[in-house]
Amino acid sequence: MIIGLGDIYVQIPHRQVAEGVMTEASRHAQAEDGCLSFTFAEVLEEPGHFVVLERWNDERAIERHYRSPAFADYQRSIARLLVRESEYRLHRVQDTSHPVDSVRIVTDQDD
């Protein structure tokens, strides 16, 4: 699995426009073959700072995404709204997910 993690810094007056651009990009990416999830979220303590979290089956899937017209549209649209250049990293990971009892984790930390 490939995980993409990025930081996007948007001009405060253009946050709503950026949210629309991100919503459209997320919708397109989630419909692509090999996309497991694609989400944007704004950092609560830092308005205008958005994080993107993507999960892809493999390199081929993310390469297809980068070549898609929707990704090119996103790049063009978001570029004019940025305060500074975005930061983005890809990580190759093994899928080792398993259920976790979050109540137990909190309880164990309190001991």
Regions from the PLM with identified roles:
Residues 41-46, 76-111:
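Glycine-rich beta-strand-turn "strand-cap" elements at beta-sheet edges
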Residues 2-40:
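N-terminal first-folded block
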Residues 10-12, 58, 92-95:
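Non-catalytic surface loops within mature trypsin-like serine protease
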Residues 2-9, 39-66:
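Short, well-ordered beta-strand segments in beta-rich or mixed alpha/beta enzyme
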Residues 24-36, 55-90:
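An amphipathic, aromatic/His-enriched active-site/gating alpha helix that lines ligand/cofactor pockets
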